[in-house]
C-alpha cells in the first residue's frame, strides 16, 4: 500500500527537492551539525542566540515545509536540531555539567543564586490557525531543546517547557513583511499566560529569527529573557 501511495503521490526532499525522500541524507545532516552562537539585540540589551544556520537554501525550505506542508513530517529533524541547540545553550548559560563547555556570551537576566536553577523554555506563540492545523514548529522544537538542555545540565538545574505566551486577538502574520513592518506588527501583539518568578532563567525558542521583533515582544511580556534558540537567522554565517 505504501508503495502504491508513493507511486500516486511521489514525495520530494523538503530541503533539496530530490525525489522519493521526505528528507535526503544530506539535508537531514543539517540538523546534526553544531549550533552557531551569536548575539541579538533584545529590548533590554544583547542576548545570546544559538541557531543552526542561515535562513537560506535547504534549511529555509525545510522550515517552510514544516510550517506549511501537511505531507512533510520533519519531526526527526526538529528533534535532532533541537538537541544541538540545547547542547549549545547549556554552554552559553553556564548550565552544562562540564565547566569547559561554558561560552562567554552576555545572558540578559541576572543568574539565579543557590543550588537550584529553574529554566523555562518558552516557544514563540503560533496563530490559532496553525495550532488548529497542528503545524506548529516552535513548540516541538522547544521540547527537543529542553530535553537536551536538561540531559546535559549540571545537578540542580530543572528545565521545563512552558507554553507561556499567546498572540492577542487580531495579531497578524509576520510572513512577507519588511523589517519595519515586522517591528510594528509585533508591538503589543502578545500576552503572557504566566510569568516566571524571580531568578528563573528564560529561553525563547522560535523557528526563525529575522528582525528580532518577536523576541523583543516575548521579552516584554515575560519580563526578560536569558537566551534565544532558533533554527535559522538571516545573515548569521559569514
Each predicted region: which residue ranges?
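Glycine-rich phosphate/pyrophosphate-handling loop used in enzymes and phosphotransfer proteins
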Residues: 1-238
Amino acid at each position: 500500500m505504501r508503495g502504491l501511495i508513493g507511486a500516486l503521490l511521489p514525495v520530494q526532499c523538503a530541503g533539496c527537492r530530490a525525489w522519493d525522500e521526505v528528507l535526503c541524507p544530506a539535508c537531514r545532516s543539517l540538523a546534526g551539525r553544531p549550533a552557531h552562537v551569536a548575539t541579538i539585540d533584545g529590548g533590554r540589551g544583547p542576548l545570546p542566540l544559538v541557531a543552526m544556520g542561515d535562513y537560506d537554501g535547504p534549511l529555509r525550505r525545510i522550515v517552510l515545509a514544516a510550517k506549511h506542508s501537511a505531507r512533510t513530517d520533519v519531526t526527526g529533524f526538529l528533534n535532532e536540531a533541537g538537541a544541538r541547540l540545547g547542547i549549545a545553550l547549556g554552554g552559553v548559560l553556564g548550565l552544562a555539567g562540564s565547566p569547559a563547555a561554558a561560552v562567554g556570551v552576555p545572558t540578559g537576566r541576572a543568574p539565579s543564586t543557590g543550588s537550584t536553577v529553574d529554566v523555562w523554555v518558552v516557544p514563540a506563540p503560533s496563530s490559532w490557525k496553525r495550532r488548529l492545523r497542528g503545524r506548529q514548529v516552535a513548540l516541538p522544537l522547544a521540547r527537543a531543546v529542553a530535553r537536551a538542555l536538561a540531559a546535559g545540565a549540571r545537578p540542580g538545574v530543572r528545565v521545563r517547557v512552558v507554553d507561556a505566551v499567546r498572540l492577542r486577538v487580531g495579531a497578524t502574520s509576520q510572513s512577507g513583511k519588511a523589517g519595519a513592518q515586522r517591528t510594528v506588527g509585533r508591538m503589543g501583539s502578545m500576552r503572557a499566560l504566566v510569568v516566571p518568578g524571580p531568578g528563573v532563567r528564560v529561553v525563547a525558542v522560535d523557528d526563525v529569527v529575522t528582525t528580532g521583533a518577536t523576541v523583543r515582544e516575548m521579552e516584554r511580556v515575560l519580563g526578560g529573557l536569558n537566551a534565544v534558540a532558533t533554527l535559522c537567522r538571516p545573515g548569521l554565517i559569514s
